[in-house]
Amino acid sequence: MIELDKSNFEEEVLKAEGTVLVDFWSPSCEPCKALMPHVHDFEE
């Protein structure tokens, strides 16, 4: 899993070969927290 920001978004996402899953989230977002274990499953 890669943490994205302005400096690497284009290279890691827009220029990536293949499929990329980008998860936008916030520590205060309860639905985001609920999905996080499933996002980690994709990483494996």
UniProtKB/Swiss-Prot annotation:
Query: The Thioredoxin domain covers which part of the protein?
Result: 2-44
| One Pfam family here | Thioredoxin
Here the disulfide bonds are: 29-32
Keywords, ordered alphabetically? Disulfide bond, Electron transport, Redox-active center, Transport
| Superkingdom of origin | Bacteria
Kindly indicate whether the keyword Disulfide bond belongs to this entry: yes
- Is-annotated flag, keyword Transport? yes
Instruction: List the residue ranges forming a coiled coil, or say none.
Output: none
SUPFAM superfamilies associated with the record? Thioredoxin-like
Functional note? Participates in various redox reactions through the reversible oxidation of its active center dithiol to a disulfide and catalyzes dithiol-disulfide exchange reactions.
Q: What's this protein's family per the entry?
A: Belongs to the thioredoxin family.
Question: What is the protein name for this chain?
Answer: Thioredoxin
The species this protein was found in: Tissierella creatinophila
